[in-house]
Amino acid sequence: MDRRRFLVGTAAIVVVPLGSASATPEAMAEAIRKVVGDSAVTESRVTLDLPPLIENGNTVPLVVSVESPMTVADHVKAIHVFNEKNPQPNVFSARLSARNGRAAIGTRIKLGDSQKIVAIAETSDGRFWSASADVIVTLAACLEEST
Amino acid sequence: MRALHFGIGLAIIFAASWAAAQVGADKRRSGTQDMGEALQKMQDDDTANPGMLFVQLGSQSWAKKAGTADKSCADCHGNAGTSMKGVAARYPAIPKGAEAPVDLDGRINLCRTENQKAERLPPESRELLALEAYVAHQSRGLPIAPPADPRLDAFRDQGAAIYRARQGQLNLSCAICHDDNAGRKLAGVTIPEAHPTGYPIYRLEWQTLGSLKRRLRNCLVGIRAEPYASEAPEYVMLELFLMDRAKGMVLEAPGVRP
Amino acid sequence: MANVLVNAPKTAKRGSVVEIKALIMHPMETGFRPGTMGKIIPRNIIERFTATWNGTEIFDMEMSPAIAANPFVSFFAVASESGTVGLRWTGDEGFVVEERVVIAVE
């Protein structure tokens, strides 16, 4: 079999299903506004850890951590994660306190497509901090009958 | 005591370098090696590997009485940690009194119908996958060791023939992807060598655990061939061939795959 | 039967920070996927995961359909005193699962 026929043949397998409902960058901005209100958001202190290339969007490991002493006087109160292309912009919202000792949360998320992910942290002084990541989601090969 | 520790330390170093030398000699790659670091970590950590939820479920089923014989797996087989060790590494095999080989789920269902006098568990059902995962997990870390049963040869040869035959609208064989083009990219995905080292696997695409049969069916659909019926003997023949091709590779069940 | 895997240390030094990891079997059906007959499969997700230490809430997470099937969550806690960490998942269709682990603080 020659290389071209192989590529032509296999490329046809990867048909992208088009989603109907979808969040948008605007919907994400709106969801973020609901959390932060009119406060300024500083792009600092937050680390968003995702694999550089995502092998399957159904289960994407993600860790959000925030630099903070996590004392009663100075700690992270909340961590929120948003996305711009899933059907809904919210991924999760977690509440923390000095009882956590470290402001870091790990979980696994679904990503319908390559897109931007934003994490926002609220500290006990009422300020907001953020980090964002652009992720590339590759499609799995050889799926089953569409269900 | 210190000398003993030193000795053990040396032994570990030698074992590790011996293993590294083996890897150097053996060019075969498990699908694990084609995954990114995040997924490898997910597979290796038992409290992060979602397949372990099924292993836990399987350990509960193992002890549960079933059927009119009112027997559990444990009533006959005792502690799976000893009785099932190495079993997954040598399947498919021909059961006593039978003429055709069965895979691990086939064997579990034979136990259900013949010994427990219970109904068969449906293919890809959670209970069957959980039991399969629990049994396979007992062989984790062991090399794949197909039995030296000459009656298997004909079935294995048929599996090899299926592996090499072109089929489907795309006119591809298993071998074209997984031998000739393994390691290259299919869209963004690295084509693996197709060694059945991790079954049943937690495939992220499925968002659940699944059997080798389900994976083979996905391949067939991928090349637009008609998949064999759900419990067709072709799957067992292919598995016999693939397990022989992966002989000596280490079992990782339950594997995580994209 | 609840099918949960929890990873937390059995013992911890007083004041140290420990990591707690929890994995639970759940489909996290988004409510956006069509089923075999083209009809949308109804949403069935875990909406909330909370953790308590001797009854006091130490962690609370609101989940969305974007959390992957068989949800995994890891977080940290200060080992303040010996006791029980209670984990609770609640969601659609009356889903409630509770799990406890005991941590001895020295």
Predicted segments, located by residue:
Chain B
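Post-cleavage N-terminal segment of exported redox proteins
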Residues: 2-54, 82, 92-157, 183, ...
